[in-house]
Design a protein with these regions (language model features):
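Extracellular loop and loop/strand-boundary signature of outer-membrane beta-barrel proteins
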Residues: 59-64, 118-123, 170-182
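Transmembrane beta-barrel architecture of outer-membrane proteins
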Residues: 49-51, 72, 129-133, 153-155, ...
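Outer-membrane beta-barrel translocator domains and adjoining extracellular loop/strand segments
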Residues: 54-61, 101-110, 116, 154, ...
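Residue-level signature of outer-membrane beta-barrel architecture
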Residues: 36, 80-82, 139-140, 151-153
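Membrane-spanning beta-strand positions in outer-membrane beta-barrel proteins
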Residues: 42-44, 86-88, 136, 140, ...
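Well-ordered mid-protein domain cores that form the structural environment of catalytic cofactors
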Residues: 92-133
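N-terminal, post-signal peptide beta-strand-biased segments of exported outer-membrane/organellar beta-barrel
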Residues: 1-97
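Transmembrane beta-barrel outer-membrane domains
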Residues: 23, 65-73, 124-130, 178-183
């Protein structure tokens, strides 16, 4: 799928098991109430490399493989206690979804006539890009209970490229902005 792995080395090391308790500014996107555990301003920046390589072999033995296997997933989070530590405000900027898949112009995806058994059946390029901006605020409801609220503003762009019979090419692009919330 296009869901990106969890952000940051610490959270990756925890195998994504970070929703219940996060002890850094990346709590902004999953559990902003945890920001109340942070007693000083904090900035967390990550630039996670991801390697995705796919090889396909059909029933007749023809093969195809992807190119541009390295992807880079940036994320940045900042939080700061305010008003005598009664509130913590935060801002997260991440890419929660978005990877691409591009098949080499050879084998099953060759764009030469009468080659490429997959040429007309599936996109040879697909890409989903997203940017999530997530301002948050956290506060204590009682001595033992904290609450956090966040606004999710997400931009996305989707692109597909596919060969069309007999020698054409179809490109579809779409983008949009959505809003939501997290707590």
């Amino acid at each position: 799928g296009f869901r990106n792995p969890t952000s940051g080395a610490i959270n990756l090391g925890r195998s994504g098991g970070r929703i219940a308790h996060v002890d850094n500014a990346s709590a902004i996107t999953q559990n902003p109430a945890n920001l109340m555990d942070l007693k000083r301003p904090e900035v967390t920046v990550s630039f996670n490399p991801v390697y995705i390589s796919v090889e396909h072999q059909n029933a007749s033995g023809a093969t195809a493989e992807t190119e541009n296997a390295w992807k880079f997933l940036p994320a940045a989070y900042a939080s700061m206690p305010i008003l005598d530590d009664k509130y913590v405000i935060g801002l997260g900027i991440t890419s929660p979804y978005g990877l691409s898949n591009e098949w080499k112009n050879a084998g099953g995806f060759a764009d030469t006539a009468n080659q490429g058994s997959l040429r007309y059946t599936t996109p040879h390029f697909s890409e989903l890009q997203t940017i999530l901006v997530n301002p948050t605020v956290a506060f204590d409801v009682s001595e033992k209970v904290s609450m956090g609220l966040g606004l999710d503003i997400q931009w996305s762009q989707l692109t597909f490229k596919q060969h069309v019979f007999p020698n054409g090419r179809f490109v579809a692009e779409s983008d949009g902005i959505g809003a939501g919330a997290n707590r």
